[in-house]
Design a protein with these regions (language model features):
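Conserved beta-strand scaffold positions in the cores of enzyme catalytic domains, especially
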Residues: 4, 57-59, 124-126, 153, ...
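A contiguous loop/helix-start segment that scaffolds small-molecule binding in enzyme catalytic cores
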Residues: 4, 167-246
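Glycine-rich anion-binding loop/nest that anchors nucleotide
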Residues: 6-8, 35, 155, 174-178
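Short internal beta-strands
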Residues: 27-37, 126-128, 197-202
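Residues at the C-termini of beta-strands that transition into short coil/loop
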Residues: 35, 61-63, 128-130, 155-157, ...
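Class I SAM-dependent methyltransferase SAM-binding "motif I" and its flanking Rossmann-like core
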Residues: 103-169, 219, 232-236
Length: 246
């Protein structure tokens, strides 16, 4: 029976990976990772050059990604079957298997769906990782929250009206799953009066990183690894007498 270790890989730059994750990956005899059919897989690319020459790789290829709406019954059936099958395969493997997961495994990570299926069937360890959004707001060079700011994490797949409601009720916000949903996100930000303060970070901490004001972006689409940010402006200690400040 296998022992499953899921390692969070952080936002993309291998140097931002946890020391424990780095050590486990380099020592792994078996790894597993998610990928879209025909693609190398972002998680696999992050660990390029770190793996033992004899490592056995298990590529878990999604049966569907953006071909069907995420709320489609067919989408749910396909993904549920996919996770069921891979949970069974991982349990049946001998020895230790290191599962790679971008960001943090317990923060919107695909591994969560395996985790719930593996509990009680096999020994599991999860190694935390820096989230992708953390890397992105550091790329802007600005703190994301101050004082009592309320931070909302939204999905670009939500309806425009839902996005507007949440955007108007928080101080700082992060929008994930942008990609082809960017036009909807942009309209929602404009309706909420927050477009002027929004940033688009593409490929945060990775090669090809690009940071731009969303209002200045002409394209209707963006890469999968892109996040929209609006920074909070909350309570902070201010210098009472600026003229004598050091």
């Amino acid at each position: 029976m296998a022992r499953i270790i899921c390692t969070g890989l952080g936002p993309g730059d291998p140097e931002l990976m946890a020391v424990r994750a780095d050590r486990l990956i380099r020592a792994a005899s078996q790894i597993a990772y998610f990928r879209k059919a025909g693609r190398a897989g972002q998680a696999r690319q992050i660990v390029e050059g770190m793996l033992a020459a004899t490592v056995v790789e298990h590529a878990m290829e999604y049966p569907v990604t953006t071909e069907l709406p995420f709320d489609s019954p067919d989408y749910n059936v396909a993904l549920a079957g996919f996770y069921d099958a891979w949970a069974a395969r991982l349990v049946a493997l001998p020895g230790e298997v290191v599962v790679l997961c971008e960001g943090d495994p317990f923060f919107y990570g695909s591994f969560m769906h395996l985790y719930t299926r593996l509990q009680g069937r096999v020994e599991i360890e999860v190694v935390p990782g820096i989230t992708g959004m953390t890397g992105c707001w550091h790329a802007t060079g600005q703190p994301i929250t101050w004082g009592d700011d309320v931070l909302a994490v939204l999905m670009g797949t939500q309806s425009e009206d839902d996005l507007v409601d949440h955007m108007g009720a928080c101080d700082a916000l992060v929008v994930m799953k942008t990609g082809r949903n960017l036009p909807r996100v942009r309209r929602a930000l404009a309706r909420a009066g927050r477009l002027a303060d929004a940033w688009l970070v593409e490929n945060g901490t990775m090669p090809g990183q690009r940071v731009r004001r969303l209002a200045e972006v002409d394209g209707a689409d963006c890469p999968y690894f892109a996040i929209v940010l609006v920074h909070g402006k909350g309570r902070r200690p201010e210098t009472a007498h600026p003229e004598v400040a050091p």
